[in-house]
Structures are given as C-alpha cells and as structure tokens.
Amino acid sequence: MLTRLFSEPGLLSDVPKFASWGDGDDDEPRSDKGDAPPQPPPAPGSGAPGPARATKPVSLRGEEVPEPTLAEVKEEGELGGEEEEEEEEEEGLDEAEGERPKKRGPKKRKMTKARLERSKLRRQKANARERNRMHDLNAALDNLRKVVPCYSKTQKLSKIETLRLAKNYIWALSEILRSGKRPDLVSYVQTLCKGLSQPTTNLVAGCLQLNSRNFLTEQGADGAGRFHGSGGPFAMHPYPYPCSRLAGDQCQAAGGLGGGAAHALRTHGYCAAYETLYAAAGGGGASPDYNSSEYEGPLSPPLCLNGNFSLKQDSSPDHEKSYHYSMHYSALPGSRPAGHGLVFGSSAVRGGVHSENLLSYDMHLHHDRGPMYEELNAFFHN
C-alpha cells in the first residue's frame, strides 16, 4: 500500500526531494551540539518524525500537523519554572536549618483565662501535697526523737542528727542481741556518738550520765584514747605515768599497773612491802575499802606534780577543799581497819609511802554525783 501511495504522482509532488536536504545541510551552520554528524532522513513510509529543522511536518496523507500554540508553550514554561523555584526554596531551607539550631520544645500557646485558672489550681494542689508531706515527715521525726537515747527540754536535735543517732542506736541494739552480753558503758556511748556533732555527743553523754570528756569520739580522736572499751579494770589508764619517785626497785617489783583484782581507781600497784598488808586485810592484793561499786566512775588521768599524783577536775564553789584524804581522816580511830591505818597514817607518810596511792577526797565532778556519793559525804563528815 505504501508503495502504491508513493507511486502516485499527485502525492509526491508536495514532498521535497532527498537531494535538496543533503545540499542544504552544507550551507547551514551546525547546532551547539554539532559534534555529532547530521542524521540522515528516515526512509519514506517509516513513520518516524524528521529532524527538528524540517520546514513542516507532514502526515502520511500529506496533511500538515498543527504547531503548538503560544499559550501552551507559556503554560509549560510556567510549570517548569514553578518546580525549579520550589526545589531552590527547599535547598535554601535545608541550608538555613543546617546553619542555625532548631527550636525545641512545645510551641507557646496563647494564655487564655481558662488555662490560667487550670494552672493556678494545679499549683495550689502541688503546694498542698508538699505541705502535707513535710508535716508528716516532721511528725515522724518527733516520734523518733522520743525513742532515741537523747532528750533535752531546751535543745532539739536536727533532722540529720536524729537520723544518724537512730541509725547508731539500732546498730548498738543489734550488736547487743548478737553478742548476748551487756556492753561497756563507754563503748556503748562511743557507738551511739559515732559520726555525731559535739553538741549531740554532749546530750547523749548527759542522758547516759557519763562525762563526755571521758571518751574520745571520731572527731577528736586520732587513734589513741584514754578509754579502750574493755580489757580489765585498768582499761581507762593503759599507760604508766612517769614519776621520779616511782623509779625505785622496791616499787617496780610490785608489778607495774597491778594485778587483775585491783580496782579501777588504782592506776598502779603498791610497793611490795605494803601488798602483804592489803592481802592480809582481805583484799587479795587490793584495798578492801575500794572494792565497792560505789567508787565506780570515770576519772581523767592524774598529773604528776613534784612526785605527787593529783586528779584533774573542774573547780566549783562546792569543791574548793583540796585537803588530802589520808591527812584529813587519819585521826579517825574507827573509820578504817588497822591495816589501812598503818598505810594511810601520818607515820606511814613520813616513812616513805608514796602519795600517789592516796586519792583526793573530791574525786568526782559535781554533776556525776548521785545519792551514793551524798551518803559517803555524810559518812565522812559525821
């Protein structure tokens, strides 16, 4: 059919010849992409479109194809331009976001009257919860202060001190239950006052009727203290005190700090010549008059002044008398046994008995005295 159409002379008269196409290519300049050689025209009847610079596209039947109008071209250009602008705007936004950090958090909304009311109500509820919580905490701490072994009408323990003391108290009670033994008073107070401040330590010691100066807590002790908890009757004074009058061989034979049966008030042993007198008096090497529990009590280390031992104590108006025990009571005929009178008499003092064995009458502080000390005081003065 195609051969039949092209064989008709009426149809081929309007179609330009192929030779004229080849001649026209040499005269016209090449396009910008003219590196590629010109394409030959398609074979007749193939249906492929010709080159773009063809004069008029012709259909197979010889009809002209209508060219696109100007409006259509403008619409296509506008659509393409809008797409390019959108891409450029997106790229610009990405670059701007990369340069400055993004704003985080919720966006601020406009505060309305209803929102203000809700916010105020929430704040009031939160304040009420916090107030009730603090009231409950204070009530619980007050109940805890009534249980711990520290009471004062004028001073109130702080919250942290109350909790620390309660922790130490629980620990001390658990140790008592574990060992099954009654603890020493000094070690018990040291356990209670571990990590506490000095005012709280003084309160605890006062409640337990113990002088706070007689034990060293962690704040003031660097390792060595006057008290070591337990270890015999001489645990209070584990070290000897140097004195020129104690350097004799006669007193050194007595055994240093004395035997285990000696009382805690005796910080060293007697001379060998007088140990037999105490043994004969029934004390077993210890003074018979100092084996009573009434003389129990904490003492500070004695001072060695001019060969004499004297106990350190606070001066008070009621205890200004510093006269010596043996010199004041040696004249009483029935106050001491015969053996004791031999040792503490004035002749014995002149004979060389060391005055460190003769304790001061006012050996206890005023606030450490109880009814038993008042009875002793009345006994000595009658």
Swiss-Prot record:
Cellular component GO terms held in the UniProt record: nucleus
**Keyword Nucleotide-binding part of the UniProt annotation:** no
PROSITE patterns membership: BHLH
What positions does the domain bHLH occupy? 121-173
| Pfam families referenced in this protein's UniProt entry, alphabetically | HLH, Neuro_bHLH
**Recorded GO terms, molecular function?**
DNA binding; DNA-binding transcription activator activity, RNA polymerase II-specific; DNA-binding transcription factor activity; DNA-binding transcription factor activity, RNA polymerase II-specific; E-box binding; protein heterodimerization activity; RNA polymerase II transcription regulatory region sequence-specific DNA binding; sequence-specific double-stranded DNA binding
Q: Where does the signal sequence lie?
A: none
User: Transmembrane segments in this chain: where?
Assistant: none
Disordered: annotated segments? 1-129
The entry's note on the tissues where this protein occurs is: Detected only in neural tissue. Expressed in the developing cerebellum and in primary granules neurons (at protein level).
Q: What does this protein do?
A: Transcriptional regulator implicated in neuronal determination. Mediates calcium-dependent transcription activation by binding to E box-containing promoter. Critical factor essential for the repression of the genetic program for neuronal differentiation; prevents the formation of synaptic vesicle clustering at active zone to the presynaptic membrane in postmitotic neurons. Induces transcription of ZEB1, which in turn represses neuronal differentiation by down-regulating REST expression.
Q: What is known of its domains?
A: The C-terminal region is necessary for depolarization-induced and calcium-dependent transcription activation.
Among PANTHER family, the record links this protein to: BASIC HELIX-LOOP-HELIX PROTEIN NEUROGENIN-RELATED, NEUROGENIC DIFFERENTIATION FACTOR 2
Q: What is this protein called?
A: Neurogenic differentiation factor 2
